[in-house]
C-alpha cells in the first residue's frame, strides 16, 4: 500500500506512477490502520518513523546526498530495524534484510522503544511535561 502525507491527496500522485495492481496500490486509509498491517515504512523523514518502530514495523528513510537529512530516530535504536537509503539498491537491500529479521527480537525492541520514548497522556504525565516546560 502507498499512503501519501495526510495533507496531500493520492489523486495527485496516481497519474505519475503506473503501479496500480493488486499488490501495490494507493490508499487514503487512516495511517494507523495502514501501518499496523505494513511490513516496512518507507518515508523521507517524519515522526511516523518512531511510531512505526514502536509497533514493530521496520523503517527505511529515503535520503538525498544533496539535502540535509532529517532523521528522527535516536542512535540508541539498533539499525537492524531502520536504515537510511540513498539509492534504490540500498532500499532493495534493506527490504530484503527486513524479511530475515527475528520477529521475537523485533517485538522486544518495539516494546523497549515504547517504554523509552512514549508516554501515555495521563493527567500526571501532562502536568509533569508542563512543569518541565516552565523550568526551561
Task: Indicate where each model-derived feature is located.
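C-terminal alpha-helical cap of glycosyltransferases
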Residues: 118-136
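Acidic donor-binding loop of glycosyltransferase active sites
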Residues: 36-44
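Short beta-strand elements in bilobed, periplasmic/extracellular small-molecule ligand-binding domains
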Residues: 1
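Catalytic binding pocket for nucleotide-activated donors in carbohydrate/polymer assembly enzymes
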Residues: 4, 9-21, 47-118
Amino acid at each position: 500500500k502507498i499512503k501519501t502525507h495526510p495533507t496531500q491527496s493520492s489523486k495527485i500522485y496516481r497519474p505519475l506512477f503506473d503501479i496500480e495492481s493488486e499488490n501495490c496500490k494507493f490508499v487514503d486509509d487512516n495511517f494507523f490502520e495502514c501501518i499496523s498491517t505494513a511490513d516496512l515504512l518507507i518515508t523521507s523523514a517524519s515522526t511516523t518513523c518512531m511510531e512505526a518502530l514502536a509497533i514493530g514495523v521496520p523503517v527505511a528513510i529515503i535520503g538525498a546526498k544533496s539535502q540535509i537529512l532529517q532523521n528522527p530516530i535516536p542512535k540508541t535504536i539498533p539499525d537492524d530495524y531502520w536504515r537510511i537509503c540513498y539509492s534504490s539498491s540500498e532500499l532493495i537491500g534493506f527490504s530484503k534484510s527486513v524479511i530475515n529479521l527475528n520477529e521475537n527480537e523485533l517485538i522486544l525492541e518495539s516494546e523497549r522503544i515504547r517504554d523509552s520514548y512514549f508516554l501515555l497522556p495521563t493527567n500526571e504525565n501532562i502536568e509533569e511535561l508542563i512543569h518541565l516546560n516552565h523550568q526551561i
